């Protein structure tokens, strides 16, 4: 059986997340995936598939390109424009329901305000490597998808 994996998941490794009004250790963390990957790598019937880089095009096809661009630089901008912080989360959130009957609004310019525009919860803080880890996860999903579609197109038609 084939499996798809990247070590880049280590790049998203926050120490805390805000959930239920408290600072908590994240439930999803690199060590959890490391254990799964180790079990697969040492299993006699598993084969790791090398990933195909897909770039940002597929991501921007399904997400607001401005949000993708923002997330690519948000952590670094926050360090310069607001303060040095290992984890970055929004302080406030844009509430589109408050704008009912008005135009759709536009993203604010300050990075700390943009966090609340593009992010909508506090259990996934941004860290220095979050964007790279997220784009690598897309390569995992799309490489697997490519393989499935390739095998379907190669299958004989009955």
Sequence positions of predicted segments:
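HDAC/HDAC-like amidohydrolase catalytic core signature
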Residues: 1-158
């Amino acid at each position: 059986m084939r499996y798809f994996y990247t070590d880049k998941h280590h790049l998203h490794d926050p120490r805390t997340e805000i959930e239920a009004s408290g600072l908590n250790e994240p439930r999803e963390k690199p060590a959890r995936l490391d254990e799964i990957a180790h079990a697969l790598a040492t299993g006699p019937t598993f084969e790791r598939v090398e990933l195909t880089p897909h770039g940002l095009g597929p991501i921007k096809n399904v997400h607001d390109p401005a949000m993708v661009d923002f997330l690519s630089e948000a952590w670094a901008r926050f360090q310069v424009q607001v303060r040095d912080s290992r984890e970055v989360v929004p302080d406030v959130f844009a509430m589109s329901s408050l704008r009912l009957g008005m135009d759709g609004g536009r993203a604010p310019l300050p990075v700390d305000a943009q966090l609340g525009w593009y992010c909508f919860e506090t259990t996934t803080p941004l860290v220095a490597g979050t964007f790279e880890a997220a784009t690598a996860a897309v390569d995992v999903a799309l490489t697997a998808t490519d393989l499935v579609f390739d095998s379907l197109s190669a299958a004989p038609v009955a």
